[in-house]
Amino acid sequence: MKVQLEDTGVNLNNIDSIRDYRNDILTNVRKYFSDTMSTEILSPVETYTAKTTTYDGGAASTYALNHALNYNPDYADFNGFGGDCTNFVSQCLYEGGGLPMHYGTPYTKTCWYYTTSTNRSSSWTGAEELYDYIFSNSSKINANISNWNSVSFGDIIQLTSGGEGYHSLIVSGIQYSSYGKSDLLVCAHTADRRHVSLASYYPGSNKRYIDITSSDL
């Protein structure tokens, strides 16, 4: 007796007919899930892209002006322990400029953070270490080596000797004359300076200029 599913046309006595029907079902199921995944599941999902935090140099310079002579009690004072200059500049980048901390192993320069005086990265408090971190492969801070003409509010200036940084300053203002840009005004700790002339207070020193732009955190 010939047995047949009326709504499918499958001949249950014919193995080829059954196999063809099964293959048709599998094909339709795959197509259904493929269409569903692409339209209902995959389309709302965004591919991961690194978050970028834009550096606010103006706010960093405002923080510098507010705390150059008035130390923030949330941070240890490293005067007498190698100096507080880079601790202060790091505060400006974070508290004022809005750059997120990059946590990691304490006392290393593969990260950039401060929790306590004994739980911090060396790049938070050391001039050369901060420079090394910023321009390392592990850095989350985006910056460029710049020059006197190009740096602006919130950028870093480091005094160097033998090619290594030993003192960090932050730009808090720019002076102009009738001929154009004439001087940079800076803030610093150790020694504490607020909005002073770079040319007058640090004449003849070798300097490097760091233009901070953003963070990838």
Each model region followed by its residue ranges:
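Active-site scaffold segments
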Residues: 86-95, 168-172, 186-188
